[in-house]
Regions:
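Ferredoxin-type iron-sulfur electron-transfer modules in oxidoreductases and energy-metabolism complexes
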Residues: 5-159
Length: 159
């Protein structure tokens, strides 16, 4: 009886299966993948520093379970916040040598009203993440990166 009273943003499909459409829509909006086909000259295999590999590995452990999305008071149908998982994936893919080719596109996707500024810093996402991913660290870094991108946009710099 109590289980029926727990409020959720994601509709329950059946036991242990929820509709993660909002989460996947956020990942699509933020271009949370690396293009392997297209006009890019990929050249030799990309290299990452050991330091970058270390924190990128932590972010790559995300299994898109939606726990962070569900625990966040700023996500759901009433609020269009992209959620911590999508923002963390933007950081992950922007750090990848090949993923950097779409860095500006990803940053623009989190610069709107539903993006980085909608995070209320409740930090529920970190508390519930089953993989202990440092989501708030990613959100803080993406906040910095979007600020830098905004300045570049004002002055017309592509770098």
């Amino acid at each position: 009886e109590k289980a029926k009273q727990v409020p959720t943003f994601t509709p329950l499909v059946r036991d242990l299966k929820v509709d993660r459409t909002l989460l996947f829509d956020a990942l699509k909006k933020t271009h949370a993948w690396i293009d392997i086909d297209g006009p890019f000259d990929l050249g030799p295999g990309p290299r990452m520093s050991a330091r970058t590999q270390s924190w990128a590995y932590e972010l790559s452990r995300c299994m898109t379970c939606g726990c962070c999305f569900e625990a966040c008071p700023n996500t759901g149908h009433a609020n269009q916040f992209l959620g911590p998982a999508a923002i963390s994936q933007v950081r992950l893919f922007n750090a990848h040598p090949t993923g950097k080719l779409n860095k500006q596109e990803r940053l623009r996707s989190i610069m709107g009203a539903d993006g980085i500024t909608s995070c209320g810093n409740a930090q529920n996402c970190v508390r519930v993440c089953p993989k202990d991913i440092p989501l708030t660290t990613s959100i803080a870094q993406m906040n910095r990166d979007t600020t830098v991108q905004s300045i570049r946009n004002v002055f017309g710099s592509d770098a």
